[in-house]
Amino acid sequence: MDAFKVIGGKPLRGDVVISGAKNAALPILMSALLSKTPVVFSNVPQLNDILTTVKLLGQLGAKTKWLNEEKLMIDASSIDVCRAPYDLVKTMRASILVLGPLLARMGHAEVSLPGGCAIGARPVNLHIQGLKLMGADITVEDGYIVAKKQGRLTGATIFMDTVSVTGTENLMMAAALAEGITIIENAAREPEIVDLANCLISMGAKITGAGTDTLTIEGVSELCGKEYSVMPDRIETGTFLVAAAVTQGHIKCLNTDPSSLEAVLSKLQEAGATITTGDDWIELEMSAPAKAVNVRTAPHPAFPTDMQAQFMTMNVLAEGTATVIETIFENRFMHVPELQRMGADIALEGNTAIVKGVASLNGAQVMATDLRASASLVIAGLVAKSPTQVDRIYHIDRGYLCIEGKLQSLGADITRIKVD
Protein backbone atom coordinates (compact mmCIF):
# COMPACT_ATOMS: atom_id res chain seq x y z
CA MET A 1 0.00 0.00 0.00
CA ASP A 2 1.21 3.53 -0.75
CA ALA A 3 1.71 6.38 1.70
CA PHE A 4 3.10 9.91 1.54
CA LYS A 5 6.13 11.00 3.52
CA VAL A 6 6.00 14.77 3.96
CA ILE A 7 8.74 16.97 5.41
CA GLY A 8 7.42 20.43 6.19
CA GLY A 9 8.89 23.88 6.30
CA LYS A 10 9.05 24.87 2.65
CA PRO A 11 6.74 27.59 1.26
CA LEU A 12 5.06 26.63 -2.01
CA ARG A 13 6.21 28.80 -4.92
CA GLY A 14 5.66 28.66 -8.67
CA ASP A 15 3.01 27.76 -11.24
CA VAL A 16 0.76 24.70 -11.16
CA VAL A 17 -1.47 23.48 -14.00
CA ILE A 18 -4.92 22.42 -12.80
CA SER A 19 -6.43 19.23 -14.19
CA GLY A 20 -9.94 18.67 -15.48
CA ALA A 21 -12.64 18.35 -12.84
CA LYS A 22 -13.33 14.79 -11.74
CA ASN A 23 -16.77 15.76 -10.43
CA ALA A 24 -17.67 17.24 -13.81
CA ALA A 25 -16.02 14.52 -15.88
CA LEU A 26 -17.86 11.62 -14.22
CA PRO A 27 -21.42 12.65 -15.26
CA ILE A 28 -20.16 13.98 -18.59
CA LEU A 29 -18.59 10.62 -19.45
CA MET A 30 -21.83 8.88 -18.39
CA SER A 31 -23.75 11.19 -20.71
CA ALA A 32 -22.05 9.48 -23.66
CA LEU A 33 -24.55 6.65 -23.05
CA LEU A 34 -27.21 9.00 -24.42
CA SER A 35 -25.39 9.63 -27.71
CA LYS A 36 -25.90 7.61 -30.87
CA THR A 37 -22.57 8.86 -32.20
CA PRO A 38 -19.02 8.73 -30.80
CA VAL A 39 -18.01 11.60 -28.51
CA VAL A 40 -14.48 12.86 -27.86
CA PHE A 41 -13.94 14.37 -24.42
CA SER A 42 -10.84 16.43 -23.60
CA ASN A 43 -9.33 17.71 -20.33
CA VAL A 44 -10.25 14.36 -18.72
CA PRO A 45 -8.05 13.51 -15.70
CA GLN A 46 -6.89 9.88 -15.59
CA LEU A 47 -7.90 9.34 -11.97
CA ASN A 48 -9.01 6.05 -10.44
CA ASP A 49 -12.70 7.03 -10.50
CA ILE A 50 -12.39 8.02 -14.16
CA LEU A 51 -10.69 4.73 -15.05
CA THR A 52 -13.43 2.86 -13.17
CA THR A 53 -16.04 4.78 -15.18
CA VAL A 54 -14.32 3.89 -18.46
CA LYS A 55 -14.28 0.24 -17.40
CA LEU A 56 -17.97 0.41 -16.45
CA LEU A 57 -18.91 1.97 -19.80
CA GLY A 58 -16.96 -0.80 -21.52
CA GLN A 59 -18.90 -3.46 -19.61
CA LEU A 60 -22.13 -1.84 -20.81
CA GLY A 61 -20.98 -2.31 -24.41
CA ALA A 62 -19.44 1.09 -25.17
CA LYS A 63 -16.16 1.31 -27.07
CA THR A 64 -13.59 3.52 -25.34
CA LYS A 65 -10.15 4.71 -26.41
CA TRP A 66 -7.67 7.16 -24.91
CA LEU A 67 -6.45 9.37 -27.78
CA ASN A 68 -3.83 10.96 -25.53
CA GLU A 69 -3.31 11.37 -21.79
CA GLU A 70 -6.32 13.68 -21.39
CA LYS A 71 -8.50 12.99 -24.44
CA LEU A 72 -10.99 10.10 -24.42
CA MET A 73 -13.27 8.77 -27.16
CA ILE A 74 -16.48 6.99 -26.15
CA ASP A 75 -18.72 5.25 -28.69
CA ALA A 76 -21.94 4.06 -27.04
CA SER A 77 -23.83 3.66 -30.32
CA SER A 78 -24.17 -0.09 -29.85
CA ILE A 79 -24.49 -0.56 -26.08
CA ASP A 80 -26.24 -3.83 -25.31
CA VAL A 81 -25.94 -4.34 -21.54
CA CYS A 82 -28.14 -2.64 -18.94
CA ARG A 83 -26.55 -3.89 -15.72
CA ALA A 84 -23.89 -1.99 -13.74
CA PRO A 85 -22.31 -4.70 -11.55
CA TYR A 86 -21.52 -4.49 -7.86
CA ASP A 87 -17.79 -5.12 -8.27
CA LEU A 88 -17.41 -1.76 -10.05
CA VAL A 89 -20.19 0.25 -8.40
CA LYS A 90 -19.02 -0.60 -4.87
CA THR A 91 -15.82 1.41 -5.35
CA MET A 92 -17.45 4.57 -6.71
CA ARG A 93 -20.69 6.19 -5.63
CA ALA A 94 -20.94 8.15 -8.90
CA SER A 95 -21.75 4.88 -10.68
CA ILE A 96 -25.39 5.68 -9.88
CA LEU A 97 -25.11 8.22 -12.73
CA VAL A 98 -25.57 5.45 -15.32
CA LEU A 99 -29.13 4.92 -14.07
CA GLY A 100 -30.78 7.87 -15.82
CA PRO A 101 -28.94 7.59 -19.16
CA LEU A 102 -29.40 3.80 -19.43
CA LEU A 103 -33.08 3.99 -18.60
CA ALA A 104 -33.68 6.86 -21.04
CA ARG A 105 -31.73 5.22 -23.86
CA MET A 106 -32.54 1.53 -23.36
CA GLY A 107 -35.76 1.51 -21.35
CA HIS A 108 -34.07 -0.72 -18.76
CA ALA A 109 -31.34 -0.24 -16.17
CA GLU A 110 -30.00 -2.31 -13.30
CA VAL A 111 -27.52 -0.54 -11.04
CA SER A 112 -26.03 -1.89 -7.83
CA LEU A 113 -26.56 0.33 -4.82
CA PRO A 114 -23.42 2.49 -4.69
CA GLY A 115 -20.28 2.77 -2.57
CA GLY A 116 -17.57 5.45 -2.46
CA CYS A 117 -16.34 7.66 0.40
CA ALA A 118 -17.79 6.79 3.82
CA ILE A 119 -18.91 10.33 4.63
CA GLY A 120 -22.62 9.91 5.13
CA ALA A 121 -25.78 8.36 3.81
CA ARG A 122 -26.03 10.28 0.50
CA PRO A 123 -29.36 8.52 -0.26
CA VAL A 124 -30.36 7.65 -3.82
CA ASN A 125 -34.08 7.96 -3.12
CA LEU A 126 -34.17 11.37 -4.85
CA HIS A 127 -33.00 9.74 -8.10
CA ILE A 128 -35.61 6.99 -7.80
CA GLN A 129 -38.49 9.32 -6.92
CA GLY A 130 -37.73 11.60 -9.85
CA LEU A 131 -37.51 8.77 -12.38
CA LYS A 132 -40.78 7.32 -11.07
CA LEU A 133 -42.46 10.67 -11.74
CA MET A 134 -41.19 10.34 -15.32
CA GLY A 135 -43.02 7.03 -15.65
CA ALA A 136 -40.38 4.50 -14.66
CA ASP A 137 -41.20 1.32 -12.78
CA ILE A 138 -38.46 0.95 -10.16
CA THR A 139 -37.80 -1.75 -7.57
CA VAL A 140 -34.82 -2.69 -5.42
CA GLU A 141 -33.94 -6.37 -5.80
CA ASP A 142 -30.96 -8.13 -4.20
CA GLY A 143 -29.04 -4.88 -3.77
CA TYR A 144 -29.77 -3.62 -7.28
CA ILE A 145 -31.96 -0.73 -8.43
CA VAL A 146 -34.03 -2.19 -11.28
CA ALA A 147 -35.69 0.45 -13.49
CA LYS A 148 -37.90 -0.19 -16.50
CA LYS A 149 -39.99 1.90 -18.89
CA GLN A 150 -41.86 0.84 -22.01
CA GLY A 151 -41.16 3.51 -24.61
CA ARG A 152 -39.75 6.94 -23.78
CA LEU A 153 -39.78 8.49 -20.35
CA THR A 154 -42.38 11.22 -19.91
CA GLY A 155 -41.61 14.80 -18.94
CA ALA A 156 -42.66 15.78 -15.43
CA THR A 157 -42.32 18.49 -12.81
CA ILE A 158 -39.95 17.24 -10.13
CA PHE A 159 -39.32 18.99 -6.82
CA MET A 160 -36.10 17.85 -5.14
CA ASP A 161 -36.72 17.53 -1.39
CA THR A 162 -33.07 18.32 -0.74
CA VAL A 163 -30.46 19.79 -3.05
CA SER A 164 -28.63 16.87 -4.68
CA VAL A 165 -25.87 17.24 -7.26
CA THR A 166 -25.93 13.65 -8.52
CA GLY A 167 -29.72 13.58 -8.31
CA THR A 168 -29.97 16.68 -10.48
CA GLU A 169 -27.45 15.24 -12.94
CA ASN A 170 -29.19 11.88 -13.23
CA LEU A 171 -32.62 13.40 -13.79
CA MET A 172 -31.31 16.00 -16.24
CA MET A 173 -29.70 13.28 -18.36
CA ALA A 174 -32.83 11.13 -18.27
CA ALA A 175 -35.05 14.10 -19.15
CA ALA A 176 -32.91 14.97 -22.18
CA LEU A 177 -34.41 11.97 -24.05
CA ALA A 178 -37.86 12.06 -22.43
CA GLU A 179 -41.04 12.92 -24.27
CA GLY A 180 -42.22 16.38 -23.27
CA ILE A 181 -40.92 18.98 -20.85
CA THR A 182 -39.31 18.22 -17.50
CA ILE A 183 -38.93 20.88 -14.83
CA ILE A 184 -36.54 20.18 -11.95
CA GLU A 185 -37.18 22.51 -9.01
CA ASN A 186 -34.73 23.01 -6.14
CA ALA A 187 -32.06 21.79 -8.55
CA ALA A 188 -28.39 21.88 -7.63
CA ARG A 189 -26.56 24.95 -8.96
CA GLU A 190 -22.94 23.75 -8.92
CA PRO A 191 -20.63 24.66 -11.83
CA GLU A 192 -20.40 20.93 -12.59
CA ILE A 193 -24.17 20.95 -13.25
CA VAL A 194 -23.69 23.79 -15.72
CA ASP A 195 -20.84 21.90 -17.39
CA LEU A 196 -22.99 18.78 -17.82
CA ALA A 197 -25.85 20.88 -19.21
CA ASN A 198 -23.49 22.52 -21.71
CA CYS A 199 -22.22 19.09 -22.75
CA LEU A 200 -25.76 17.80 -23.28
CA ILE A 201 -26.67 20.96 -25.21
CA SER A 202 -23.67 20.34 -27.47
CA MET A 203 -25.20 16.92 -28.21
CA GLY A 204 -28.54 18.48 -29.16
CA ALA A 205 -30.37 18.64 -25.83
CA LYS A 206 -32.69 21.55 -25.03
CA ILE A 207 -31.91 22.74 -21.50
CA THR A 208 -32.37 26.12 -19.86
CA GLY A 209 -31.78 27.35 -16.32
CA ALA A 210 -28.50 25.55 -15.57
CA GLY A 211 -26.85 27.32 -12.65
CA THR A 212 -30.22 28.32 -11.17
CA ASP A 213 -32.52 26.31 -8.90
CA THR A 214 -35.00 25.61 -11.72
CA LEU A 215 -33.98 23.49 -14.70
CA THR A 216 -36.20 23.14 -17.76
CA ILE A 217 -35.47 20.29 -20.16
CA GLU A 218 -37.42 19.82 -23.38
CA GLY A 219 -36.87 16.22 -24.38
CA VAL A 220 -35.60 15.29 -27.85
CA SER A 221 -35.76 11.96 -29.68
CA GLU A 222 -32.00 11.48 -29.98
CA LEU A 223 -28.66 13.01 -29.04
CA CYS A 224 -25.51 13.03 -31.17
CA GLY A 225 -22.28 14.11 -29.53
CA LYS A 226 -19.09 15.35 -31.15
CA GLU A 227 -16.45 16.94 -28.92
CA TYR A 228 -16.51 18.48 -25.46
CA SER A 229 -13.88 19.78 -23.02
CA VAL A 230 -14.36 19.21 -19.28
CA MET A 231 -14.16 22.24 -16.96
CA PRO A 232 -11.11 22.76 -14.70
CA ASP A 233 -11.20 21.28 -11.20
CA ARG A 234 -12.23 24.01 -8.77
CA ILE A 235 -11.56 21.81 -5.73
CA GLU A 236 -8.04 20.94 -6.85
CA THR A 237 -7.52 24.66 -7.43
CA GLY A 238 -8.79 25.50 -3.96
CA THR A 239 -6.64 22.80 -2.38
CA PHE A 240 -3.44 24.21 -3.90
CA LEU A 241 -4.42 27.75 -2.93
CA VAL A 242 -4.96 26.71 0.69
CA ALA A 243 -1.67 24.79 0.70
CA ALA A 244 0.11 27.92 -0.52
CA ALA A 245 -1.64 30.05 2.09
CA VAL A 246 -0.79 27.68 4.96
CA THR A 247 2.89 27.50 3.92
CA GLN A 248 2.98 31.30 3.39
CA GLY A 249 3.88 30.82 -0.25
CA HIS A 250 3.20 32.41 -3.62
CA ILE A 251 1.65 30.33 -6.41
CA LYS A 252 -0.26 30.75 -9.65
CA CYS A 253 -2.91 28.20 -10.64
CA LEU A 254 -3.20 27.88 -14.43
CA ASN A 255 -6.02 26.39 -16.54
CA THR A 256 -8.63 27.17 -13.90
CA ASP A 257 -11.80 29.24 -13.56
CA PRO A 258 -11.95 31.92 -10.84
CA SER A 259 -15.71 32.36 -11.28
CA SER A 260 -16.31 28.84 -9.95
CA LEU A 261 -14.48 29.58 -6.68
CA GLU A 262 -15.86 32.90 -5.49
CA ALA A 263 -16.79 31.74 -1.97
CA VAL A 264 -13.38 30.10 -1.46
CA LEU A 265 -11.43 33.09 -2.78
CA SER A 266 -13.41 35.42 -0.54
CA LYS A 267 -12.54 33.35 2.54
CA LEU A 268 -8.86 33.20 1.56
CA GLN A 269 -8.80 36.98 1.27
CA GLU A 270 -10.49 37.21 4.67
CA ALA A 271 -7.67 35.02 6.02
CA GLY A 272 -5.13 37.54 4.73
CA ALA A 273 -4.16 36.23 1.30
CA THR A 274 -3.48 38.57 -1.61
CA ILE A 275 -5.31 37.19 -4.64
CA THR A 276 -5.16 38.24 -8.29
CA THR A 277 -7.22 36.61 -11.03
CA GLY A 278 -7.40 36.46 -14.81
CA ASP A 279 -9.75 34.65 -17.18
CA ASP A 280 -8.12 31.26 -16.54
CA TRP A 281 -5.66 31.77 -13.68
CA ILE A 282 -5.54 32.61 -9.98
CA GLU A 283 -2.48 33.94 -8.16
CA LEU A 284 -2.16 33.81 -4.36
CA GLU A 285 0.49 35.30 -2.09
CA MET A 286 0.55 34.91 1.68
CA SER A 287 3.25 36.68 3.68
CA ALA A 288 2.01 36.12 7.26
CA PRO A 289 0.12 33.50 9.26
CA ALA A 290 -3.53 33.19 8.30
CA LYS A 291 -6.25 34.86 10.32
CA ALA A 292 -8.96 32.50 11.59
CA VAL A 293 -12.03 32.42 9.33
CA ASN A 294 -15.46 30.98 10.09
CA VAL A 295 -16.74 28.50 7.51
CA ARG A 296 -20.23 27.13 6.94
CA THR A 297 -20.68 24.64 4.13
CA ALA A 298 -23.82 24.81 2.01
CA PRO A 299 -24.86 24.10 -1.59
CA HIS A 300 -23.36 26.28 -4.33
CA PRO A 301 -22.90 29.24 -4.54
CA ALA A 302 -22.08 29.03 -0.82
CA PHE A 303 -18.89 27.52 0.60
CA PRO A 304 -18.30 24.01 -0.81
CA THR A 305 -18.19 21.01 1.51
CA ASP A 306 -15.27 19.64 -0.53
CA MET A 307 -13.09 22.51 0.78
CA GLN A 308 -14.07 22.18 4.45
CA ALA A 309 -11.22 19.88 5.50
CA GLN A 310 -8.55 22.01 3.82
CA PHE A 311 -9.82 25.16 5.56
CA MET A 312 -9.88 23.25 8.85
CA THR A 313 -6.12 22.75 8.50
CA MET A 314 -5.62 26.43 7.70
CA ASN A 315 -7.61 27.41 10.80
CA VAL A 316 -5.59 25.01 12.97
CA LEU A 317 -2.54 27.23 12.38
CA ALA A 318 -4.37 30.55 12.14
CA GLU A 319 -4.36 33.48 14.54
CA GLY A 320 -7.56 33.32 16.60
CA THR A 321 -10.51 30.95 16.92
CA ALA A 322 -12.82 29.82 14.13
CA THR A 323 -15.97 27.74 13.83
CA VAL A 324 -16.37 25.29 10.97
CA ILE A 325 -19.97 24.16 10.41
CA GLU A 326 -20.69 21.20 8.10
CA THR A 327 -24.29 21.17 6.82
CA ILE A 328 -24.01 18.87 3.79
CA PHE A 329 -22.72 15.50 5.03
CA GLU A 330 -22.59 13.80 8.40
CA ASN A 331 -19.34 12.04 9.34
CA ARG A 332 -17.24 14.65 7.55
CA PHE A 333 -15.02 15.50 10.50
CA MET A 334 -13.04 12.26 10.39
CA HIS A 335 -9.84 14.22 9.73
CA VAL A 336 -10.15 15.97 13.10
CA PRO A 337 -8.69 13.15 15.27
CA GLU A 338 -5.76 12.90 12.85
CA LEU A 339 -5.10 16.65 13.03
CA GLN A 340 -5.34 16.42 16.83
CA ARG A 341 -2.58 13.79 16.74
CA MET A 342 -0.40 16.47 15.16
CA GLY A 343 -1.22 18.99 17.90
CA ALA A 344 -4.37 20.70 16.63
CA ASP A 345 -6.75 22.25 19.17
CA ILE A 346 -10.20 21.31 17.86
CA ALA A 347 -13.42 20.67 19.80
CA LEU A 348 -16.41 19.03 18.13
CA GLU A 349 -20.02 19.82 18.96
CA GLY A 350 -22.33 17.98 16.58
CA ASN A 351 -21.81 19.38 13.09
CA THR A 352 -19.61 22.21 14.38
CA ALA A 353 -15.87 22.26 14.94
CA ILE A 354 -14.38 24.96 17.15
CA VAL A 355 -10.77 25.49 16.08
CA LYS A 356 -8.27 27.40 18.20
CA GLY A 357 -5.13 28.29 16.31
CA VAL A 358 -1.82 26.87 17.51
CA ALA A 359 1.70 28.09 16.76
CA SER A 360 2.87 24.88 15.10
CA LEU A 361 2.07 21.24 14.35
CA ASN A 362 4.22 18.19 14.95
CA GLY A 363 4.60 15.48 12.35
CA ALA A 364 2.89 12.15 13.01
CA GLN A 365 1.73 9.00 11.29
CA VAL A 366 -1.83 9.79 10.25
CA MET A 367 -4.50 8.02 8.25
CA ALA A 368 -6.56 9.36 5.36
CA THR A 369 -10.27 8.61 5.77
CA ASP A 370 -11.74 10.14 2.64
CA LEU A 371 -10.67 12.12 -0.40
CA ARG A 372 -10.67 15.68 0.94
CA ALA A 373 -9.59 14.69 4.46
CA SER A 374 -6.46 13.17 2.95
CA ALA A 375 -5.66 16.47 1.24
CA SER A 376 -6.01 18.32 4.55
CA LEU A 377 -3.51 15.96 6.19
CA VAL A 378 -0.99 16.48 3.38
CA ILE A 379 -1.34 20.25 3.84
CA ALA A 380 -0.76 19.84 7.59
CA GLY A 381 2.36 17.83 6.81
CA LEU A 382 3.69 20.64 4.63
CA VAL A 383 4.05 22.87 7.72
CA ALA A 384 4.68 20.31 10.48
CA LYS A 385 7.91 20.61 12.50
CA SER A 386 8.84 16.96 11.95
CA PRO A 387 8.14 14.38 9.20
CA THR A 388 4.57 13.23 8.60
CA GLN A 389 3.42 9.95 7.08
CA VAL A 390 -0.05 9.94 5.51
CA ASP A 391 -1.37 6.39 5.11
CA ARG A 392 -4.20 5.07 2.91
CA ILE A 393 -3.57 7.62 0.18
CA TYR A 394 -5.63 5.62 -2.29
CA HIS A 395 -8.32 8.07 -1.17
CA ILE A 396 -6.34 11.04 -2.50
CA ASP A 397 -5.56 9.22 -5.75
CA ARG A 398 -9.31 9.10 -6.41
CA GLY A 399 -9.51 12.86 -6.77
CA TYR A 400 -6.08 14.43 -7.35
CA LEU A 401 -3.95 13.74 -10.41
CA CYS A 402 -0.30 13.26 -9.36
CA ILE A 403 -0.64 15.57 -6.38
CA GLU A 404 2.86 14.76 -5.12
CA GLY A 405 4.42 15.66 -8.49
CA LYS A 406 2.61 18.99 -8.59
CA LEU A 407 3.56 19.78 -4.99
CA GLN A 408 7.19 18.83 -5.68
CA SER A 409 7.23 21.25 -8.62
CA LEU A 410 6.20 23.98 -6.16
CA GLY A 411 9.06 23.11 -3.80
CA ALA A 412 7.37 20.72 -1.37
CA ASP A 413 9.31 17.81 0.13
CA ILE A 414 6.83 14.97 -0.42
CA THR A 415 7.48 11.43 -1.63
CA ARG A 416 5.32 8.39 -2.29
CA ILE A 417 6.52 5.37 -0.34
CA LYS A 418 5.50 1.72 -0.01
CA VAL A 419 4.26 0.54 3.40
CA ASP A 420 3.04 -2.80 4.72
Curated annotation (Swiss-Prot):
Sites where the protein binds UDP-N-acetyl-alpha-D-glucosamine: 93, 306, 328
Catalyzed chemical reaction(s): phosphoenolpyruvate + UDP-N-acetyl-alpha-D-glucosamine = UDP-N-acetyl-3-O-(1-carboxyvinyl)-alpha-D-glucosamine + phosphate
Compartment(s): Cytoplasm
GO molecular function term, any single one: UDP-N-acetylglucosamine 1-carboxyvinyltransferase activity
UniProt-annotated binding residues for phosphoenolpyruvate: 22-23
Cellular component, GO, one term: cytoplasm
Record InterPro entries: Enolpyruvate_Tfrase_dom, Enolpyruvate_Tfrase_sf, MurA_subfamily, RNA3'P_cycl/enolpyr_Trfase_a/b, UDP_GlcNAc_COvinyl_MurA
Modified residues (2-(S-cysteinyl)pyruvic acid O-phosphothioketal): 117
Keywords (A to Z) from UniProt: Cell cycle, Cell division, Cell shape, Cell wall biogenesis/degradation, Cytoplasm, Peptidoglycan synthesis, Pyruvate, Transferase
Enzyme nomenclature, EC number: 2.5.1.7
Paired cysteines (S-S): none
NCBIfam families with a match to the protein in the record: murA, PRK09369.1
Function summary: Cell wall formation. Adds enolpyruvyl to UDP-N-acetylglucosamine.
Protein name: UDP-N-acetylglucosamine 1-carboxyvinyltransferase
Gene that encodes the chain: murA
